[in-house]
Amino acid sequence: MKQTNRKADLPLLLLAVVLIFLIVCPVGMIFAKAVIQNGRLDFSPAVQTLLNPENAHMIGNSLLLGVLVVLLSTLIAAPLAYLFSRTKFARYRVFDILFMIPFMTPPYIASMGWILFMQKKGLLQQLVPAAAGCEKIFFTLGGLVLVMSLHVFPFMLTMLKNAMLNIPSSLEEAGAVFGAGFGARMRKLFLPLLSGNYAIGALLVFVKTLSEYGTPSTLGKRIGFEVFTTEIHRHATVAPIDFGSSATLSSVLVGICLCMWMLQNYITTRKSYNLVSGKGARRVEQSMSKGAAIGAWAYIVLVLLIAVGVPYFSVISTSLINLRGYGLAPGNFTIAHYVELFTENEKGLSALKNSVFLAVTSATICAVLGTLLVLAVRKSHSKLRKVVEAIGLLPEMLPGIVLVIGIMLFWNQIYNILPLYNTMGIMVLAYVVLFLPYTVQYVTSSFTQISDSLMAAGQVFGGSPAYILRRITLPLIRQGIATGWMMTFIIAFRELVTASLIAPPNTLVVSTFIVREFEQGSVSVGMAMAVLCVLFSTTALLILNTVIDRRKEH
């Protein structure tokens, strides 16, 4: 029996070795670089980095930004969550798609759109000359908070809406029967029941804000607002390069994120309510007066205009402008910038090819490795399986820039053994490490719906493990594999921070091409690439949803 168990655990052990090499070693290298100097333990450089007034100010900036983004995203999402869960607006499923557009839009593209719209003599002032001077209001901390909140509020909206849908209407009706008005029901009923879900959503938004690089690097730098990610990036890329400071700041950021995850787990266990049971629960739409309905429509349209309309209008119109000096003047529009990307601009075409190659390769490797990981964990009964699964999901808990710094340090250290650093191979490896959790989660979700009796039936009828895997398991989990592949492809195609840190010399991808053109003044060409990037990602997502819906029907 022990011999059989060892054979069953062998794939798990091999995967454990691979994951430790790919994930744990780079993370460990960050902490080692922060405290080991010249081969001996030395905390003084790390302490000096943390006590540096500029770094202390930067840490304060990051925490302040995280809190403000949580507050503003809550103010935006809470009314929408109530409308889409308790009123007639819940019938309009199209809003579920529309309000995911800001979240699916790359943050650096959205922030560029806002910069083009709000800058001096920008698109807003061309449309409304009376708005001159408004750039002084936007290019502040408030503008940065607004742009980042417009990116993450759909996540908060989804969390709150799903939580509200689980609150039985009978509880609200009971409150009304006992004389509680709308405000009292919100205060005494909804808020306590939502506190656990809201805390989880707020902590996740906070961590995502701390981990975000795209918006702080484009808009934050313009207002001189430095945060964790931009400082870590600067220490790792701008001379004099200081990997020690970069590793120290990365360690602090990891510590904050892990504390947030621990706090989330604590809240989940202490502040959760069992609102869904075997007993049926009906949903009753709250009636709305004509004035309230008009106000609700106005709010929904306003949020969509600000979150989707402004950045997309700016990006698309700028990509079509012939001469920037003439702006939105009639006759000043052309598609020449799109034609240039596919004909004259060799770097643009090369960036597209590189992005497609990296996205396809990393998505395929993630699909294979993630599926093998889930299969090995499910098959094994060893205590090691929980550890291996946790390692596979670890990249999701850590900021992407931290993992990339760790990969840089680790693979640079072993360059003489494995000369992968400074090649396209290191980019593929980094993408695989960053996006492996997507496949693991989607395949695991598919596995939870498979009854063990199916496997047992296959064994009873003489099926070998390979036959059962090929004819039973894989057909049942292929949707999860396909979903994980597509999500990895979409996110890898537009990834910015990894490409900006470890791309080989003179190698551009879509994201770095857009940023470079934007910063060097070829804004229209950069925005043309941004439009193609968004169209590519959106089309892939729509294809994915169509395939999933068709399979559900069959």
Regions found by a protein language model. Give the residues of each.
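Glycine-rich helix-loop "coupling/hinge" segments at transmembrane-helix boundaries
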Residues: L116, G214-P240, G327-G331, I490, ...
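Short cytosolic juxtamembrane segments of multi-pass membrane proteins
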Residues: L171, S272-V284, L454, G463, ...
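Membrane-water interface segments at the C-terminal ends of transmembrane alpha-helices
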Residues: K7-G39, L51-L165, L193-G214, T218-G220, ...
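The alpha-helix within a helix-turn-helix
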Residues: G175-A176, G458
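Short, Lys/Arg-rich, polar N-terminal cytosolic tail immediately upstream
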Residues: M1-R6
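Alpha-helical transmembrane segments of integral membrane proteins
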Residues: M262-Y299
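Peri-membrane helix termini and adjoining interfacial loops of integral membrane proteins
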Residues: A34-P45, Q119-A130, K221-T230, K271-G280, ...
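Glycine/proline-centered hinge or cleavage motifs at structural transition points of membrane proteins
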Residues: F178-A180, P192, F461-G462, P475
